[in-house]
């Protein structure tokens, strides 16, 4: 079982972005001290839902601040950035961190970001497969040319090569950074499976929905010629929420008190690029749903819920939102308890 944190750098009502980012950095430092496996960083623009606009930039800082823990993006949005630029950044972080970086990618949403960064609605609706293909080419080949509808350019040399990681004895370790794909639809599940890429599944999904997506991924990957061994060992990641307290109701109350205000403020701030109608989740009902799905409660309850999800879905990697209280000290305590009290119950 590999348990990590999911860091949104959430800006709660009454807070500034600096407070949210400081909490993100501190929670990562505590995660490493507490023995957790990884930290996953979200990326958002123009909204207080999450105030980190560049997951790879924050990943670079956190990789420099830590020595053991893995740091991943959850996710870097391909619809609003050039896949070659992202590939260069990923290779750089992979090589300079000793292989501790994971690149999570997704297509994002139909937000005004598409207008600001120039991709347009076309990039969101049709461009993800081409962007992913170009990114994977960059991470795996010595020379790359752009031959798609969106990206066309002459062949260039890949520098630095992501597959030239130095080992402790001075040799080279083959392979570039791990790449995972955020999947919210069968179409994206099939795309990830055909590429043999693990999935990152959202915290709004229950175990049955995640199990169904894993089953679709497995059948598609096998049909695409992936080996049974690679399919069995695919490291899918389940996103969730964790709040550890001595009593179940105490943990739930902490989140129900703080999260709805953040959700309401953050979700209402999203603006669609084309004015399409959108229905916002009820913040209180959504918080209560998350409390029922995920490890929210005493250490034993939290461990049992993680173990149950692993048994039902086959997923043994977790990215858990730990800042739901909105408070720095409470977040640090929550992360510490997750690592020192819950994790030992899973080994």
Predicted feature residues:
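An alpha-helical appendage that flanks or caps ligand/catalytic pockets
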Residues: 122-163, 208-316
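N-terminal beta1-alpha1-beta2 module of alpha/beta enzyme domains
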Residues: 1-73
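Conserved, mostly hydrophobic/aromatic
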Residues: 31, 35, 43, 62, ...
């Amino acid at each position: 079982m590999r348990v990590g944190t999911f860091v949104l750098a959430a800006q709660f009502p009454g807070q500034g972005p600096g407070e949210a980012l400081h909490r993100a950095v501190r929670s990562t430092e505590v995660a490493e001290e507490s023995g957790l496996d990884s930290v996953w960083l979200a990326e958002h623009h123009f909204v207080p839902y999450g105030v980190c606009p560049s997951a790879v930039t924050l990943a670079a800082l956190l990789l420099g601040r830590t020595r053991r823990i893995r740091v991943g993006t959850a996710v870097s949005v391909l619809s609003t950035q050039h896949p070659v630029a992202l590939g260069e950044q990923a290779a750089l972080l992979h090589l300079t961190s000793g292989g501790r970086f994971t690149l999570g990618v997704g297509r994002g949403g139909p937000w005004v970001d598409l207008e600001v960064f120039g991709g347009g609605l076309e990039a969101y609706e049709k461009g993800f497969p081409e962007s992913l293909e170009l990114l994977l080419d960059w991470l795996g080949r010595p020379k790359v040319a752009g031959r798609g509808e969106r990206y066309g350019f002459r062949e260039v040399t890949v520098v630095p090569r992501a597959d030239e990681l130095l080992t402790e004895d001075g040799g080279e370790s083959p392979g570039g950074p791990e790449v995972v794909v955020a999947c919210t639809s069968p179409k994206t599940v099939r795309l990830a499976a055909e590429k043999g890429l693990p999935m990152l599944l959202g915290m709004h999904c229950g175990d049955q929905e995640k199990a169904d997506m894993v089953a679709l991924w497995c059948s598609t990957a096998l049909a695409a010629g992936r080996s049974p061994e690679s399919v069995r060992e695919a490291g899918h990641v389940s996103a969730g929420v964790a709040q550890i307290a001595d009593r179940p109701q105490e943990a739930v109350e902490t989140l129900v008190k703080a999260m709805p205000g953040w959700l309401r403020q953050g979700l209402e701030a999203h603006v669609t690029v084309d004015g399409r109608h959108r229905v916002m989740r009820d913040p209180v009902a959504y918080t209560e749903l998350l409390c029922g799905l995920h490890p929210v409660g005493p250490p034993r309850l939290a461990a049992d819920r993680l173990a149950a999800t692993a048994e039902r879905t086959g997923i043994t990697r977790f990215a858990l939102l730990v800042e739901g209280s909105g408070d720095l000290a409470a977040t640090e305590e929550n992360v510490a308890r997750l690592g020192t009290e819950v994790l030992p119950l899973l080994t």
